[in-house]
Amino acid sequence: MTDTRIERDSMGELAVPATALYGAQTQRAVNNFPVSGQRMPQAFVRALLLAKAAAARANVSLQQLDAPMGEAIADTCLQLLQEDFMQHFPVDVFQTGSGTSSNMNANEVVATLASRRLGGKVNPNDHVNCGQSSNDIIPSTIHISAALEISERLLPALRHLEQTIQSKAGEVHAYVKTGRTHLMDAMPVRMSQVLGGWAQQVRQAGVHIESVLPALQQLAQGGTAVGTGINAHPRFAERFSQELNDLTGLAFRPGDDFFALIGSQDTAVAASGQLKTLAVTLMKLANDLRWMNSGPLAGLGEIELEALQPGSSIMPGKVNPVIPEATAMVAAQVIGNDAAIAVAGQSGNFELNVMLPLVADNLLHSIQLLANVSRLLADKAIASFKVNQGKLSEALARNPILVTALNPIIGYQKAAEIAKQAYREGRPIIDVALENTDLDRARLEVLLDPEKLTAGGL
């Protein structure tokens, strides 16, 4: 038995692995693009198969395919989704800019299996690709995959992170710590106020990400090659969206303008921008956690993160803040992905963007990373850290910035003199204020009470 078989396409004959479900066009792409060894994302291929199933059903309803053939195509797509389908999709991310290679990969695999199911010939171009062009199915698949991943993975992960932060805020409400601006001592804050700020950042990032879903749910499908809809039934776009909604439970619809959706990737650029904002938020949270956990002896030591693994191959007993570090690296990667997507978004020449696979890969990579690390940050860092009350109290007692509360009574200049003396002499602020003002200790204890100062006001 030979290891290959001969397949044919419009360019001629080509040897293909004997057991491969794909055909000549996929094999040409494999031969042409041995670039990264990185295949198109699983979420993208999943969405592409859903789109092919929706297209087949739409074409049956519009009498563009006979029912047995259309059903064979749709059923094949859905069956593939229940299996290890990625083994049949070997095309590299760095391929033709339209993603035609990935489209034909899907068409050929589905045609092979649908032919077996039907007991007759199913053609990759004429049947599986009926009413479609790579130029509308690939932009549509980018939107479909991103919308699904955001809805099913990222937004639930962000809700979990926010809820975990809120729960921890309630747990640590009684603790008051030294606030810091410019990494320098400032007025006191409650730990719950710090975490409340984090929760709001995460919540707002989620709102902004969710706000791009209506745009992602507008599809280029039906515009075919250049946006005019050539070779697609006039009602194909509408029927396609209806069938896709039945399969996904989302609210996809034909785009307001096919020319814009095929010629540009503005929606993906906008979505990536919101993902970058979330990355910036998570970087801030990670850095706050690392600083508060620093030490344990020579740093701030305000909290103790859960010890998850040894931190050094040479220094025994060292434990590092590995989850915040992983979070910070994810944030850096997402910011880099956003830059790549922005460059790719500029690469729309006339009627087609020609960096579609790059957009898909980076956008879905960012969503995946952010969803996964948000859950890790919640479960393995925020939920389990412990507060070091001794460190908090020690720092508060020696914080001359508490004198700020005396500004309305003794004035800024006098307060500054007291703060500087307390710094210089290493004495508690209340003792220095007692010597340099007419206020008695009882009054100063009320005015300089860190807990009361966290409530603001005069």
UniProtKB/Swiss-Prot annotation:
Reaction catalysed by this enzyme: (S)-malate = fumarate + H2O
Annotated CDD domains: Fumarase_classII (cd01362)
TM helices/strands, residue ranges: none
Keywords: Cytoplasm, Lyase, Tricarboxylic acid cycle
Subcellular location: Cytoplasm
Enzyme class at the top of the EC tree: lyase
Entry annotation: catalytic residues: 182 (proton donor/acceptor), 312
Conditions for induction: Part of the fumC-PA4469-sodA operon which is repressed by iron (at protein level).
Superkingdom of this protein's organism: Bacteria
EC number(s) per entry: 4.2.1.2
Family matches, as PANTHER family: ASPARTATEAMMONIA/ARGININOSUCCINATE/ADENYLOSUCCINATE LYASE, FUMARATE HYDRATASE CLASS II
HAMAP family for this protein: FumaraseC (MF_00743)
Protein name: Fumarate hydratase class II 2
Native source organism of the sequence: Pseudomonas aeruginosa (strain ATCC 15692 / DSM 22644 / CIP 104116 / JCM 14847 / LMG 12228 / 1C / PRS 101 / PAO1)
